[in-house]
Amino acid sequence: MGHKVNPIGLRLGINRTWDSRWFAGRHEYGKLLHEDIKIREVLEKQLKQAGISKIVIERPHKKCRVAIHTARPGVVIGKKGADIEKLRREIGKITASEVHLNIVEVRKPEIDATLVAENIAQQLERRVAFRRAMKRAVQSAMRLGAGGIRINCAGRLGGAEIARTEWYREGRVPLHTLRADIDYGVATAKTAYGTCGVKVWIYKGEILEHDPMASERRALEGGDSGGGRSRRDDRG
């Protein structure tokens, strides 16, 4: 079961929490949900080069608070805050609520699964050898304290006639252990031969207490640390 489902969804309410944090009545729920989807689409399109890890949306009374987790906060903010004001106006066109933007720096992008997946996808688009891109990402993650990492690349890798899946793993990635802090990210590389999918799982240790905010708090404090013995599985 743990190998089939999204590891973040499996741990919601245990050591992970939702990226949209608000409550609404049945008449408003659909409208606010569509607003969230549009806000995420606009931000991901405008900030494609900013290394966006995730976007958290909270809705206090008549307000819309958006936290953008990024590896390059300077790109998001812009010169003298010009870009962030532009983003605030764009979001203001989507929602009637008062918009507040908060930029959160990702201190260790090498152990953020979404950023690692996007980085590998960009390398595949630049025709970097997929094995080299995967191994480089694995080595960087393990060097910065990850307990384990697994990377899957699927598609016409290297321009092959037949699509296949290649994977590389180092350390422990206990997907069945609910107390394990597993980060998961996906990205799509649009190559000349077609699309290639990239999936990344990163194990950052165990969270023993029942705390849905524990994983996010650990990331904000920069205290990501792996646990357990390391095992290497080198395919190619």
Swiss-Prot record:
Keywords: Ribonucleoprotein, Ribosomal protein, RNA-binding, rRNA-binding. The keyword RNA-binding applies. It comes from Parvibaculum lavamentivorans (strain DS-1 / DSM 13023 / NCIMB 13966). One of its GO terms (cellular component) is cytosolic small ribosomal subunit. This is Small ribosomal subunit protein uS3. Part of the 30S ribosomal subunit. Forms a tight complex with proteins S10 and S14. NCBIfam families: rpsC_bact. Residues 39-107 form the KH type-2 domain. The gene is rpsC. SUPFAM superfamilies: Prokaryotic type KH domain (KH-domain type II) (SSF54814), Ribosomal protein S3 C-terminal domain (SSF54821).
